[in-house]
């Protein structure tokens, strides 16, 4: 926090930690977080889910249709059901018929893209505001709220003070940044965001603290041993993929219902694959996935709200690289020392020589961050041992 606050003061780029940037980043984090959690549930039960992108597409279309017909809450339910349909197709293909899991995921992505386009032609063409590539707008927006006292929310009709907003306006060292970040996280919050955040601790508790979670993880670590102990691996993989599909569908629903008010072709924009990157970055752990999703969401938020601040972010990266360089030397990690040194040199040169960032590079920032994170991810990654390996019950292994 001290580093980013120093960078903000040095470069006079208040947008780096403004409530607008953080609020936008939070909204953009939600679908990536849910996509990452969808990948977690699938791979923890032993099945690769490359089809998250397609399940999100099902969710965007079904959610927008439900919101158009019945309102946003029903729309979110339809989004979950749409994603679960994709999860069920993937389960039948990979668990029942042992089709290659990567091929099945790719086919689901293609089927979703062309399938919803066909449905749009049947349902939306000729309707007011609709067409082959978009749906009519939803009936009303999903409710949002502000936290009382902190961000000006109401208590029994009384409008409370906006303490964090006041603190942000002071722009004091560290405190002003905390005010901007805090207000961005507590002002104009959608209930869909709350649901997405709750998914993280609930998934952690279910997967690591319940009998069901233990059995599901065992089907991804050692299905043969699990079967010998009486665990129904096939059934658990169906459950895992249905949950995975539901979360992916909900991720798509937040795009067409919360981030927008209608379905639009190409709305997912590769977020399903970025979600898979957050899963790897997070080492197949919910807390790590949330950290990765926040990183990608912030990168996209800066791109949309504070594109003029991207050059200032080079200085922030350089400062972080110095700290990472010192840490790597202390831990005697040669590869990480080299990575930190290269990152420092590139970011320092970019900060000193680049005045404006080309629009094409600005638009690709989230994907550049994805590549950097995957290239520098912890080498001690431990995926589920049998994720992606076909399993046939009752056969000798």
Predicted regions and their residues:
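Helix-loop-helix hairpins and the membrane-proximal interhelical loops
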Residues: 1-33, 37-41, 45, 387-397
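Cytosolic-side transmembrane-helix boundaries in multi-pass membrane proteins
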Residues: 1-6, 151-157, 203, 221-235, ...
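Inter-helical junctions in multi-pass inner-membrane proteins, predominant
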Residues: 13-24, 121-124, 207, 211, ...
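Single transmembrane alpha-helix segments in multi-pass membrane proteins
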Residues: 20-76, 80-106, 276-289, 376
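Short, non-helical or kinked segments that cap or interrupt transmembrane helices
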Residues: 41-62, 95-108, 215, 238-239, ...
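Short loop segments and helix-boundary regions at transmembrane helix junctions
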Residues: 43-47, 86-169, 209-211, 267-270, ...
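Helix-loop-helix "hairpin" substructures at the membrane interface of multi-pass membrane proteins
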Residues: 184-262, 286-287, 291
């Amino acid at each position: 926090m001290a580093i980013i606050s120093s960078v903000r003061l040095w470069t006079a780029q208040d947008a780096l930690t403004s409530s607008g940037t953080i609020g936008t980043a939070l909204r953009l984090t939600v679908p990536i977080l849910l996509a990452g959690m969808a990948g977690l549930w699938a791979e923890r039960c032993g099945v690769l889910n490359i089809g998250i992108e397609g399940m999100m597409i099902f969710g965007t279309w079904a959610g927008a249709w439900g919101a158009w017909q019945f309102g946003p809450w029903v729309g979110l339910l339809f989004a979950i059901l749409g994603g679960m349909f994709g999860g069920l197709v993937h389960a039948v293909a990979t668990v029942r018929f042992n089709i290659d899991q990567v091929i099945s995921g790719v086919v689901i992505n293609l089927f979703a893209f062309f399938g919803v386009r066909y449905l749009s032609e049947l349902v939306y063409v000729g309707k007011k505001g609709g067409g082959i590539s978009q749906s009519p707008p939803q009936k009303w927006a999903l409710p949002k709220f502000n936290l009382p006292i902190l961000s000006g929310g109401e208590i029994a009709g009384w409008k409370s003070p906006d303490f964090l907003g006041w603190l942000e306006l002071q722009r004091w060292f560290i405190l002003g940044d905390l005010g901007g970040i805090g207000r961005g996280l507590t002002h104009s919050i959608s209930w869909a965001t709350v649901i997405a955040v709750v998914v993280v601790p609930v998934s952690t508790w279910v997967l690591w603290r319940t009998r069901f979670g233990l059995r599901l993880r065992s089907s991804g670590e050692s299905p043969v041993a699990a079967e010998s102990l009486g665990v129904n691996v096939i059934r658990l993989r169906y459950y895992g993929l249905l949950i995975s599909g539901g979360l992916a569908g909900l991720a798509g629903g937040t795009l067409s219902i919360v981030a927008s008010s209608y379905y639009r072709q190409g709305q997912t924009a590769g977020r399903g694959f970025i979600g898979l990157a957050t899963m790897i970055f997070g080492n197949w752990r919910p807390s790590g996935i949330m950290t990765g999703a926040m990183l990608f969401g912030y990168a996209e938020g800066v791109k949309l709200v504070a594109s003029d601040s991207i050059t200032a972010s080079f200085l922030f990266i350089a400062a972080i690289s110095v700290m990472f360089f010192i840490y790597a030397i202390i831990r005697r990690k040669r590869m990480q020392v080299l990575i930190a040194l290269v990152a420092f040199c590139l970011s320092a040169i970019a900060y000193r020589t680049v005045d404006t960032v080309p629009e094409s590079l600005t638009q690709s920032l989230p994907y550049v961050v994805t590549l950097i994170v995957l290239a520098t991810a912890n080498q001690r990654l431990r995926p589920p041992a049998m994720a992606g390996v076909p399993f046939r019950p009752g056969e000798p292994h």
